[in-house]
Regions:
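Core SAM-dependent methyltransferase catalytic element
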Residues: 254, 268-300
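Short alpha-helix
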Residues: 234-253
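A short glycine-rich, Lys/Arg-flanked "PGG" loop and its adjoining helix->strand segment in the class I
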Residues: 182-197
Length: 305
């Protein structure tokens, strides 16, 4: 994988040359194995949120030594029991997909990126979080153990990749952090090859926006009480409705499947109790979105890269 065949300058949005700097002056830098493809302005803008996010993650016990995921977690066992099922569903979906470049958007420590590499993809972990606790730098453990993947610092709304180069784009418990869902999905469509797929995994969906708004309002109160967190930061993690998803997909001329995943006995019981109380809890389906081939083009069904 070479920079001239894949990367886009985050500053001028032109193909990034092999020999830096870019003609606009942007200089590609790598630190602790992470390729920085975010502008200084973007980095400064997101830093306050990252500091607040890290505080919550540490308090809730995420990251650190909990890396052998999703099947051997040390903490949050109930959450990971659900994610094991969504992971298996995701694995079955990509089994017959032509291999090529795969992005793990919002990759965190790269535990899913490691699996993409094992399955034969040219895998890239993408995240704005480079923390050694649960961000991109934490992925060094997998690389030391033999995994092969790149780590790129970037936001999901301005991906630093050339158009139509990505075979698979997975958002792993991360799409709900997008500041604008439609802009992010439009970027995903731009970089995807015809016939490639987008998989939205472990993001909360609701039938009705009122239930999602209730969840967010409760989080705002909790995070203000526990961390003194501003409302804008507490609302960075959002939700989707099935109607909004359908409208976004249609507007971008994509096709979509929503595949339900059984959440387990406990959460099923919680869903029943919530309905009796006149509300609904979040669902976590696997959403598969496909980019169509252009009229008259030849479908490539090979399994080569």
């Amino acid at each position: 994988m070479s920079a001239d065949s894949l990367f886009l300058c985050p500053q001028c949005r032109q193909p990034l040359p092999v020999r830096p700097p870019c003609s606009c002056g942007f200089l590609l830098r790598e630190s602790n194995g992470v390729i920085n493809l975010i502008t200084d302005e973007e980095s400064a803008a997101v830093q306050p949120f990252l500091e607040a996010y890290e505080q919550v993650r540490q308090d809730e016990g995420w990251g650190g030594d909990d890396l052998d995921l999703p099947f051997h977690p040390r903490r949050h066992l109930e959450i990971w029991s659900i994610r094991q099922r969504t992971f298996r569903k995701f694995e079955s979906i990509v089994a017959d997909l032509s291999r090529g470049t795969a992005l793990d958007i919002g990759a965190g420590n790269g535990w899913m990126t490691r699996h993409l590499d094992r399955w034969g993809f040219d895998a890239i972990a993408v995240d704005i979080n480079t923390s050694p606790m649960d961000g991109l730098r934490a992925g060094q453990k997998f690389i030391d153990e033999g995994a092969s993947f790149l780590r790129v610092r970037s936001g999901m709304e301005r991906l630093p990749f050339l158009s139509e180069r990505i075979r698979l784009l997975a958002t792993n418990a991360s799409f709900h952090y997008a500041s604008d869902f439609r802009i992010a999905l439009s970027e995903f469509e731009r970089v995807l090859t015809p016939g490639g797929i987008i998989a939205i995994v472990d993001s909360p969906f609701y039938e009705n926006a009122a239930d999602g708004e209730r969840m967010m309002a409760e989080r705002v109160v909790e995070f203000r009480r526990k961390y003194g967190m501003p409302e804008t930061f507490a609302r960075r993690s959002r939700y989707l409705t099935y109607k909004d998803l359908e409208e976004m997909v249609r507007s971008l001329n994509l096709s979509c499947q929503v595949l339900p995943v059984w959440p387990g006995f406990r959460r099923s019981y919680e869903a029943i109790r919530a309905k009796f109380a006149g509300r609904n809890i979040a669902e976590f389906p696997v959403v598969v979105i496909e980019k169509h081939f252009a009229m008259g083009s030849n479908r490539d069904t090979s399994h080569g890269s």
